[in-house]
Amino acid sequence: MKKNRERFCNREREFVYKFKVGSQCLELRVPLKFPVQENASHLHGRLMLLHSLPCFIEKDLKEALTQFIEEESLSDYDRDAEASLAAVKSGEVDLHQLASTWAKAYAETTLEHARPEEPSWDEDFADVYHDLIHSPASETLLNLEHNYFVSISELIGERDVELKKLRERQGIEMEKVMQELGKSLTDQDVNSLAAQHFESQQDLENKWSNELKQSTAIQKQEYQEWVIKLHQDLKNPNNSSLSEEIKVQPSQFRESVEAIGRIYEEQRKLEESFTIHLGAQLKTMHNLRLLRADMLDFCKHKRNHRSGVKLHRLQTALSLYSTSLCGLVLLVDNRINSYSGIKRDFATVCQECTDFHFPRIEEQLEVVQQVVLYARTQRRSKLKESLDSGNQNGGNDDKTKNAERNYLNVLPGEFYITRHSNLSEIHVAFHLCVDDHVKSGNITARDPAIMGLRNILKVCCTHDITTISIPLLLVHDMSEEMTIPWCLRRAELVFKCVKGFMMEMASWDGGISRTVQFLVPQSISEEMFYQLSNMLPQIFRVSSTLTLTSKH
């Protein structure tokens, strides 16, 4: 049967088309190999161009060519089917084997016969955790997480102490060498010592990095196995003592770390809250907050000082697998790493506590790098194809050079997302790429940073993120050029743009109530903060308050 099919599939036939040009009768003969792999319309266009055929036969030629291909293909299929039936009747093909092959193919391609996919370990663990965190066992879970947090904190504290001692010792050595410079030592000796110091620091940092990585991996495995076991044991009504196994362990070392500055001290926050209404026909109500705070305050682990030891993150844990997620926007440069600036500070906070649900921040960034590399490769190949096809111009040349220069980086306005379960008040971080242009005072509503905010809000609507924190001035730190008029113009622009985006959200998600938090740097003055607070009700329609008085 396969031999017959191969013979039919490789058959060549001649397409003949006759037409008149004036008094001349012309004939077009084209050999075609069946089955014809090329689209009939494309083949027709090639024939018209290759043979310089007159335009008045274009439509008739296309119809004749299409009809010829359809008729000959159908004829081949009929002959192939007849040969297959003949092979079955003659016993050349095993009927039972053929039926089994058909049944298997049908079952694999038909949904109702397909085997249901088995739930993955991550899905099972997520369901179990969601059940437990909404049960009386939630306190037990948080106590266990806190004990793991204390363990990692002590490890980080030991690392910092050892690194500090190394730097102090190296500083003393370098100071002695500098005193002998020009006497018994040369610049080469200084450079050699500096290289040794750098190598020693790298070795020590790598040692502690590997130890932290190993400790968090062990904690994650132990925690997940313990959660599954706890869920199974709680189904047994006779086992009521398991929840008493986990007790909060105090950390004396943590107190010493606090003494040397490991605990972040919060500056006094300023905060204003507003309830607003958007829309004329479909009115939606949202909550707005204006805060003077560090963006990372929503990530750093805090203690509930009244109870003494428990992490202040119960609400974050309760909503981890819910439709009410919390996110924040970090302004980063175009390099996907955690080596400098707020990216390094954010990664440091992420490392303070093991993430029991998602990959480590380093692993997530590696995945983002691979995705960006693939996307850039695809865009570059498409752009190259368009240039090779003759559509190149000066603008496209500039785009090509720009794409090559930023081949492994994200562009301004683009963002990548990381997921977290180990931060204080957020689940999702949007890393929005901005450049130095945001520090100028002449950006518009079409600026990449503003459009990036729009796309972030759209992702919030489609992925159940109901609380989002945004840097109002599109900067995390103030500088000299950011005067009061600069701040007022920037805040007005962001307020108005976010208002428009929130009105768009009503059509995206049906008008779900959301909370948007606008953050300004901690170095901003109280006077400036209250000027921004007074601006907000002028742009958004704030709900009026109703004062009730009692009659005597």
Curated annotation (Swiss-Prot):
Transmembrane segments: none
Region (Disordered): 383-403
Keyword Glycosyltransferase among record annotations: no
Subcellular location: Cytoplasm; Early endosome
Record's keyword annotation contains Ubl conjugation: no
Any Pfam family matching the protein: Fy-3
A GO BP entry: regulation of mast cell degranulation
Domain of life: Eukaryota
GO CC terms: cytoplasm; early endosome; protein-containing complex
InterPro entries listed in its UniProt record: Fy-3
UniProt keyword terms in alphabetical order: Cytoplasm, Disease variant, Endosome, Intellectual disability
Record disease entry: Intellectual developmental disorder, autosomal recessive 66: A disorder characterized by significantly below average general intellectual functioning associated with impairments in adaptive behavior and manifested during the developmental period. MRT66 patients have intellectual disability, delayed speech development, neuropsychiatric symptoms, and relatively normal life span.
Assembly notes: Component of the FERRY complex composed of five subunits, TBCK, PPP1R21, FERRY3, CRYZL1 and GATD1 with a ratio of 1:2:1:2:4, respectively.
Function: Component of the FERRY complex (Five-subunit Endosomal Rab5 and RNA/ribosome intermediary). The FERRY complex directly interacts with mRNAs and RAB5A, and functions as a RAB5A effector involved in the localization and the distribution of specific mRNAs most likely by mediating their endosomal transport. The complex recruits mRNAs and ribosomes to early endosomes through direct mRNA-interaction. Plays a role in mast cell degranulation.
PANTHER family the record matches: PROTEIN C12ORF4
Protein name: Ferry endosomal RAB5 effector complex subunit 3
Species: Homo sapiens (Human)
